[in-house]
């Protein structure tokens, strides 16, 4: 089975870094949204990145930064506070390439 997502877009908000507890200790995590432009529309894709790539994104990127991300699609089903069935979709990022010009 293949589950691979490749996107190029712009980060929609300044990044905030969090730390989560794991069996390996605390690891950095950054949630962000990527604006991906198509011909007529813009899609806003939720993404999450961990470990060193989260550190690097937090240090060097900001709202508007253009990036290439590669990862897997995660779909979670849950029941909200109103007892409605909901679905949450996000990209678990495994690779990030910064696409902005270094002089920007």
Swiss-Prot record:
MF term (GO), any: single-stranded DNA binding
Entry GO CC: nucleoid
Disulfide bonds: none
GO biological process: DNA replication
Gene3D superfamilies, per database record: Nucleic acid-binding proteins
Keywords, ordered alphabetically: DNA-binding, Plasmid
Occurrences of domain SSB (ranges): 1-100
Assembly mode: Homotetramer.
Name of the molecule in the record: Single-stranded DNA-binding protein
Organism: Onion yellows phytoplasma (strain OY-M)
Lineage: Bacteria, Bacillati, Mycoplasmatota, Mollicutes, Acholeplasmatales
């Amino acid at each position: 089975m293949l589950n691979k997502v490749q996107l190029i877009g712009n980060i929609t908000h300044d990044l905030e870094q969090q730390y989560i507890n794991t069996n390996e200790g605390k690891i950095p995590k950054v949630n962000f949204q990527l604006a991906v432009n198509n011909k007529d529309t813009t899609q806003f894709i939720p993404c999450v990145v961990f470990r060193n790539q989260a550190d690097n994104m937090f240090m060097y990127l900001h709202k508007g930064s253009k990036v290439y991300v590669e990862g897997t699609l995660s779909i979670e089903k849950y029941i909200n506070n109103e007892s409605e069935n909901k679905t949450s979709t996000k990209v678990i990022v495994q690779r990030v390439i910064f696409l902005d010009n270094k002089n920007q």
